[in-house]
Amino acid sequence: MRMFETRAREWILLVKLVLFTSIWQLASALGSMSSIAISYGEGGSVFCGLKSDGSHLVVCYGSNSAILYGTPGHLQFIGLTGGDGFMCGLLMLSHQPYCWGNSAFIQMGVPQPMTKGAEYLEVSAGDYHLCGLRKPIVGRRKNSNIISSSLVDCWGYNMTRNFVFDKQLHSLSAGSEFNCALSSKDKSVFCWGDENSSQVISLIPKEKKFQKIAAGGYHVCGILDGLESRVLCWGKSLEFEEEVTGTSTEEKILDLPPKEPLLAVVGGKFYACGIKRYDHSAVCWGFFVNRSTPAPTGIGFYDLAAGNYFTCGVLTGTSMSPVCWGLGFPASIPLAVSPGLCIDTPCPPGTHELSNQENSPCKFTGSHICLPCSTSCPPGMYQKSVCTERSDQVCVYNCSSCSSHDCSSNCSSSATSGGKEKGKFWSLQLPIATAEIGFALFLVAVVSITAALYIRYRLRNCRCSENDTRSSKDSAFTKDNGKIRPDLDELQKRRRARVFTYEELEKAADGFKEESIVGKGSFSCVYKGVLRDGTTVAVKRAIMSSDKQKNSNEFRTELDLLSRLNHAHLLSLLGYCEECGERLLVYEFMAHGSLHNHLHGKNKALKEQLDWVKRVTIAVQAARGIEYLHGYACPPVIHRDIKSSNILIDEEHNARVADFGLSLLGPVDSGSPLAELPAGTLGYLDPEYYRLHYLTTKSDVYSFGVLLLEILSGRKAIDMHYEEGNIVEWAVPLIKAGDINALLDPVLKHPSEIEALKRIVSVACKCVRMRGKDRPSMDKVTTALERALAQLMGNPSSEQPILPTEVVLGSSRMHKKSWRIGSKRSGSENTEFRGGSWITFPSVTSSQRRKSSASEGDVAEEEDEGRKQQEALRSLEEEIGPASPGQSLFLHHNF
């Protein structure tokens, strides 16, 4: 009986140890597992992390396209680790590693060979290898003493084998060519692998005990066990200065390890960083070059992750956004990531729950993130409350003996008991309170006067009779010195959007039932509805979300743009509704849905309906709509989300460009870039815009080029069922090799006029060039597509630059539906006049202007027609993949 009790106690201790080690990994070294990780190398650097919404899904940011496009957005991970050109994570369901990116030594996906049924506690990645710690194995010796051993599986360069160690290990951390871990029994360090370049194994301080360790490129740093929590480092990269820091002393920066106690530590290539225990700020030491940015001061971090030459950390607070420092990576990353791993077990001693009620990263009931407790206070402060399971310790200033400005200002702003202290407090605060009251009264007066003037203005406008509106001139244009100019006041009155009531639209859409849904987006649903007059419409309803500001901005953007723009191939806005917290937009109904449904839907017959003539016609019509936005709206409009699901098809198979929620007004000079954070859809997103945050009309040209490849091939922009998941990376090599037949959609027979499709392929390849300035403008793209369509339709005059309007625009497309609705409105219905329209041209004007003048695109087309196909394709030679940030040059020059 006692034997069974002894075994039960040992099993309970073992389970507790496993749970503790699974949540204690608070920082990601060069190859440790955490909720955030960094991949590096010549292909570009990438930061990845688990989303802050508690979904355990991965989000990435950086310049390595293989990792960005290969990110498995549908898989849930326990933790992440990164190496040279690849990223790996531990799957939540199978507890097996899964990798993506590009590595010559590790198989992407689940690494092979993989033992059937094997489950892992944690994984760690080095430069070219990956190791995983299996769940503990418990055995029995002959003398009946229970022993624990560890089984570690490794894959990659000189590491593909199974290791069995006669001790229980945890906290795996990988260097460039080696791996280390902590012994659960005596807290000593154990390492294995190649130590020729690092000497890490021979230099292990065997008599020392550690709380945690982190391996760098060629060194290891660990936090010593005990109250002091000092850091100790060993290895070759922190001893031989000449081999690391360059030849000139002016290029060297050597920082010694800190003396303060640390909470966490991470290792880079030739340096290390840690989180200070008393204020959670970051500190770094080791070898740097003078171009490296230092660690930020005055801010705290939940977690750190190190790459080769830079470090990123998750800020404390509610934003959970990462910031980076060092060399070769942006300082700010537009993501929100989890500062740790969500667990549903109580926090172990020495840790506390992350308190963030406003935006909790853990969505499951009873789950939380555990963080280490702070054990000391900064100088001049004392501990007011100790660390508990629910919150960290609280430190306050000792106001009786202030020796710093921060202490004085903090103490002066808080009221204390006693008459003397109160008098001192009011003597400091009375001038501030007086100024605040005076400013508040001034602000109230300004707001009151402004409100009174606004109400007076609206009342005066309401008194204007309807006869005054009817007495305006019939023409929206007047002559000025022989030049035609638009009358903006008249255009403002004619460009109007009908105001619907919510009750009216709810009845039209049959109560917004799920059966009425005809489309869904990230922030809205589209319902089919029938108005009282029998008109079929599409009602776009914003989804209730916590991010109300973003939904409101997209609603306002689309309403303002579509109420001002008018073109045959832009989706027409009929009206809107904004009441009771609901935001709805009413459009004309597109009977045939989106181009995406035709090309990629499950119904094969629907795909076959779009023969080559219809596909190219849709491409021409979409191009004319985008050309109108770029060249005939003033200021230009940049759509930012051109894709097949935003190209809608009406009952006559005419195309309309839709969804202007992400659109922006561009500069009058279309060549000038806008500094904007990337927004759009992966696969269609301009790489130059994604990396440099420079937005121009050429970003829409890139997206349209991807759309052309999608129309020609029938493949999705990103389809991970293929080895080359990105359509651009797949199609461009085929075009360069002249293998056009392999590019075309196999569902359709090749047309007799194959030269027309070769023209379109050439246009698409030019549109997806890496640099925006090398791409053609939309007017040149439209001209080339119109000629290709004329040739495809068997037009005997292949030199005709412009197709007849009825071919391109559609025979019955005259904007009658929207005006018919306006004419049936009663006097009691609300109509809001939108702001002044931009100066624009009728849609047919673009064709006439391009026909009347020989543009650069026309001259280029005429010259290309006399060349052979192989010469034309050879001229398209250029790299499509993202540019390397220059790590190889940095290594060669500095190390």
UniProtKB/Swiss-Prot annotation:
Outcome recorded upon mutating residue 221 to Y: In acr4-7; abnormal embryogenesis, and reduced internalization into vesicles
UniProt KW Phosphoprotein keyword: yes
Main subcellular localisation: membrane
Gene3D superfamilies noted in UniProt: Phosphorylase Kinase, domain 1 (3.30.200.20), Regulator of chromosome condensation 1/beta-lactamase-inhibitor protein II (2.130.10.30), Transferase(Phosphotransferase) domain 1 (1.10.510.10)
Disulfide bond entries: 347-370, 373-387, 377-395
Binding site for ATP: 518-526, 540
Record topological domains on the Extracellular side: 30-434
Membrane topology: Single-pass type I membrane protein
The protein's name: Serine/threonine-protein kinase-like protein ACR4
Taxonomic source organism: Arabidopsis thaliana
